[in-house]
């Protein structure tokens, strides 16, 4: 039977960090706290651990919400690594995620990943799929077999807006995604990694799973170059079992994505199919 991931109650961590997704801000890299955080942890946080298995048929298994899925992995709610549900399953796994999609390079990134059988989650900002062009891009990503996640409507810092506005940021994007592809997102990634008590309640009501990350660098000026980005993503101390890699819909990430994915494989990591990661919504629909 499928196993659902419950959202843990957790303590608040305040950290004034810089925007990972806003290119006008300067940024520095920090390690994600390994505490049970549902609050402020910016997109410049870094840290890792892991678990999972690669499935060459990830395109088929991730496309249908109603399709029965045998979950073998879960998101660690404290440190956001990907961990096996059973001891015998592969622990040396890594998850690829792309935030701020679909901006200008999402389709190119997706096509490159698909060409090397590398699954990923594309985290969607609702503001990008209000237009017909944005909706068509989202459909293409979904039709290529990629998991679609919710990254809020306007990339607002949830800790700086009202509970009503937080609900709008999450629910509106869920509705836009569902209207476009007929599937509700299973994973939510808060802008800047800043979760709140209110967002936790909404995510629970929506049967979703919080998914921050363990490390990422592509918003920092020093790594806005394909070679530099590839090097740090493959050689950082935070690359460990269950690594949850944060990247963005950016030109340098587009240029580096194949080398990053292939480099992870060369280091012995299995690129996990997000369809194998547990969520309460998908488990209920499969029963």
What spans do the regions from the language model cover?
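N-terminal secretory signal peptides that target proteins for export/translocation
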Residues: 1-2
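N-terminal pre-catalytic segment of deacetylase/amide-hydrolase enzymes
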Residues: 6-11, 21-96, 102-111, 115, ...
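C-terminal motif of bacterial Sec signal peptides marking the signal peptidase cleavage site
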Residues: 16-20
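Short, well-ordered alpha-helical microsegments
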Residues: 105-107, 195-199, 253-255
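Catalytic grooves of carbohydrate-active enzymes
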Residues: 238-252, 256-275
């Amino acid at each position: 039977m499928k196993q659902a991931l419950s959202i843990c109650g957790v303590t608040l961590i305040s950290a004034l960090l810089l925007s990972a997704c806003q290119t006008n801000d300067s940024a520095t890299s920090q390690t994600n706290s390994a505490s049970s955080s549902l609050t402020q942890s910016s997109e410049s946080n870094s840290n890792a651990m892991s678990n999972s298995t690669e499935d060459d048929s990830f395109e088929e298994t991730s496309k249908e919400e109603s399709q029965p899925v045998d979950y073998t992995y879960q998101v660690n709610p404290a440190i956001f690594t990907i961990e096996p549900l059973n001891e015998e399953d592969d622990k040396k796994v890594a998850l690829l995620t792309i935030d701020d999609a679909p901006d200008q390079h999402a389709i190119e990134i997706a096509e490159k990943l698909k060409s090397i059988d590398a699954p990923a989650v594309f985290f969607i900002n609702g503001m990008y799929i209000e237009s017909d062009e944005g909706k068509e891009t989202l459909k293409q990503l979904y039709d290529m077999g990629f998991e679609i996640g919710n990254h809020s409507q306007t990339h607002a810092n949830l800790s700086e807006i009202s509970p009503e506005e937080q609900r709008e940021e999450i629910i509106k994007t869920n509705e836009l995604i569902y209207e476009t592809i007929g599937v509700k997102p299973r994973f939510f990634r808060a802008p800047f990694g800043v979760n709140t008590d209110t967002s936790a309640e909404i995510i629970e009501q929506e049967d979703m799973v919080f998914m921050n990350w363990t490390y990422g660098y592509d918003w920092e000026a020093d790594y806005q170059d394909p070679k530099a980005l590839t090097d740090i993503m493959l050689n950082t101390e935070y690359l460990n079992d269950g690594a949850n890699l944060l990247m963005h819909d950016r030109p340098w990430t587009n240029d580096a994505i194949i080398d990053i994915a292939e480099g992870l494989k060369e280091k012995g990591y299995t690129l996990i199919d997000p369809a194998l990661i547990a969520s309460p919504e998908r488990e209920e629909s499969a029963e």
